[in-house]
């Protein structure tokens, strides 16, 4: 059997995940079984570990005596068009199996959220420096005040609870102060200022990956999400085709790069 070996990178978790899932399509087009090996990433505790297998079941079996392995250099990012959301959803459903212990944690949070929860993803910290990595100025974070205005509008129409996913301690405090016990969130590593969680903070790398994966999966099971430009929220949209969203970078800055998921 011939395999396509898909490696990791030093990018953030869902940048790496998005590229990996996109590369499953390359495997299909070449009639190869994908084999994912995430080594020397930001999320392995040991450089010899396969971090993919911390979080997901391996996509295919591998027998070094029988299998021929082809390496794919880099990742395949699908184009920004509506069919990409449908195709990413198909690839996730076909190839991605989240570890049961992680699914159990997600299910517990979703149960506590009740019916039709509102998801809010507020990406701050090093996202303020996104222009240094090739993003436009319009991709910088939207203010918490504007997020709160959109949350208020949504909560006027329902008594839903709010799941907040954020990398920023100050954002967490501001949202708790405003919405009290309607806010549910996870216990995870958060930062302040412009410090990146995955580049600048110490801590268990494996846990950092699990925490952002749980955030994404819970967001994907909400009724509607309020988001900015981020692969975390984008992948939540890929996971669930029924999920709707408000992209505040698009609404307030005309940054339409992720509008294809709403087409």
Q: Language-model features: where?
A:
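Secretory-pathway glycan-assembly enzymes, especially type II membrane glycosyltransferases
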Residues: 2-161, 172
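Short beta-strand scaffold positions
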Residues: 164-166, 227-228
């Amino acid at each position: 059997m011939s395999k396509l070996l898909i490696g990791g990178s030093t990018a953030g978790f869902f940048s790496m995940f998005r590229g990996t899932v996109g590369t499953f399509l390359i495997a299909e087009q070449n009639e190869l079984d994908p084999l994912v090996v995430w080594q020397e990433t930001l999320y392995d505790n040991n450089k010899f570990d396969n971090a993919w297998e911390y979080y997901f079941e391996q996509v295919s079996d591998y027998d070094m005596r029988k299998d021929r392995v082809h390496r794919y250099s880099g990742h395949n990012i699908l184009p920004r068009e509506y069919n990409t959301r449908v195709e990413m959803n198909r690839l996730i459903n076909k190839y991605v199996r989240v570890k049961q212990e992680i699914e159990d944690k997600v299910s517990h949070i979703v149960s506590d959220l009740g019916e039709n929860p509102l998801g809010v993803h507020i990406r701050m910290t090093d996202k303020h420096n996104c222009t240094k990595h090739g993003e436009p100025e319009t991709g910088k974070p939207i203010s918490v005040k504007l997020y709160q205005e959109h949350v208020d509008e949504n909560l006027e129409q329902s008594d839903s609870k709010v799941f907040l996913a954020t990398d920023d301690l100050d954002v967490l405090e501001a949202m708790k102060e405003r919405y009290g016990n309607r806010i549910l969130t996870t216990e995870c590593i958060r930062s302040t200022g412009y410090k990146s969680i995955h580049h600048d903070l110490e801590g268990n790398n494996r846990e950092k990956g699990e925490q952002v994966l749980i955030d994404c999966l819970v967001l994907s099971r909400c009724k509607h999400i309020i988001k900015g430009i981020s692969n975390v929220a984008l992948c939540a949209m890929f996971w669930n085709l029924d999920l709707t969203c408000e992209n505040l970078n698009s609404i307030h800055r005309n940054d339409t790069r992720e509008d294809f998921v709403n087409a």
